[in-house]
Amino acid sequence: MADLTTKYLGLNLKNPIVVGANNLSADQNKLKRLEEAGAAAVVYKSLFEEQIQLERAQLDEELTEFDERHPEMIKTHPDIEHSGPEEHLHNLEKAKNALTIPLVASLNAVYRETWVEYVKKIEETGVDGLELNFYHVPYSFDEDGKSIEDQQIDILREVKKNVSIPVSVKLSPFYNNLLNVIRKMDEVKINGFVLFNRFFEPEIDIEKEEHRFPFNLSSKGDYKLPLRYAGLLYNNIQGDICSSTGIFSGHDVIRMILAGADCTQVVSTIYINKFGHIGNMLSEMEKWMENKGYN
């Protein structure tokens, strides 16, 4: 049998197929099914800044709800131990204990303080690694690209100071010079780069004249941009390369590995072709290796 093992973030993977962060990965039963289907690792559904800020706002509201009442009318402030991001952390720990394959947490924050606070909490759950999802849409005409890049690199520097687990960063291709940005992040000792994330893309229903929120899946052929950057980065950075977007088949995975990637992330193909497709992808890879005489 062909040897499909690889290494990513210092983790030994049985093959190069990692399931990226998505709604499926937040369900423990589905996580087990992904593991049984052959996934080498899973990235747990992202924790977003909005969830964290919402919990804080709700807590503030709950803690002051009874301030004008007589103290004998209430017992204690509401217990929110397992709500919002706290529930996310609780479920993350449960998921880690349920799986035998590596589990990577994903965080999508905005403020520097939030990044630092929550990477510490995430590390305490026992996960094997951390993926920081940099999803930044500037709303100011005065904010230049360099200031955004400097802020992100500063965040990465602080995160690396505060955790010992391996850290990867998931980036968009929309930088002035992506290679330069990755080199600077690599100098901060980031362990891996996931290329690329998918932005939320709005739509408008012209009949109802209102916003529509389509399910934003990638398409076959979308792999060509990450393929290009896997090749450009290979042997030029210390961090690992994980290709993401448009990877639908075992042949797509092979393309990425040949270009220089250490592993790949898949999501859309799981939604479209279901969990068992991971096995089909692995079979395609094994057959290709056998035909080539590789072991």
PLM regions and their residue ranges:
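Thr-Gly-centered strand-to-loop micro-motif
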Residues: G20-A21, K220, S243-S244, V266-V267
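Alpha/beta enzyme core
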Residues: Q28-E68, E86-V104, N108-C242, F248-A261
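Short, basic, glycine/proline-bearing loop/turn elements
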Residues: N12-V18, K75-P78, P166-V167
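N-terminal amphipathic alpha-helix/helix-capping segment at the start of soluble metabolic enzymes
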Residues: M1-V18, E87-N97
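Extended, intrinsically disordered, low-complexity segments
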Residues: L63-I74, Y223, G231, S283-N295
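Helical hairpin unit composed of two closely spaced alpha helices linked by a short loop
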Residues: Q265-T269, N273
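N-terminal binding-site loop/beta-alpha segment at the start of enzyme catalytic domains
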Residues: L9, N15-R33
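Short acidic (Asp/Glu) and glycine-rich catalytic loops that position anionic groups and cofactors
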Residues: A259-Q265, L282
